[in-house]
């Protein structure tokens, strides 16, 4: 995990949270199931997307490019 960039690291954390929520959805029922569903879907989407989307090639990935940069 030392050489992972921050976006992939947070994606991994989010993926773990999403998978734990899916396990909770399977095991539990009632209102807590809906709460876990609300947490699981965005977590899984972000976690999967962090690994599928290729890394940016710009050196300052967080900055928006503009004229004169």
Curated annotation (Swiss-Prot):
Source species of the chain: Methanocaldococcus jannaschii (strain ATCC 43067 / DSM 2661 / JAL-1 / JCM 10045 / NBRC 100440)
Membrane-spanning parts: 15-35, 36-56
Protein name in UniProt: Uncharacterized protein MJ0521
GO cellular component terms attached to this protein's record: plasma membrane
Key words, A-Z: Cell membrane, Membrane, Transmembrane, Transmembrane helix
Localization annotation: Cell membrane
Membrane association type: Multi-pass membrane protein
């Amino acid at each position: 995990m030392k050489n992972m960039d921050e976006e992939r690291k947070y994606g991994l954390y989010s993926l773990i949270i999403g998978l734990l929520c899916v396990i909770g959805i399977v095991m539990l029922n009632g209102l807590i199931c809906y709460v876990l569903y609300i947490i699981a879907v965005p977590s899984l989407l972000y976690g999967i997307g962090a690994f599928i989307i290729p890394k940016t090639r710009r050196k300052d990935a967080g900055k928006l490019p503009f004229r004169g940069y």
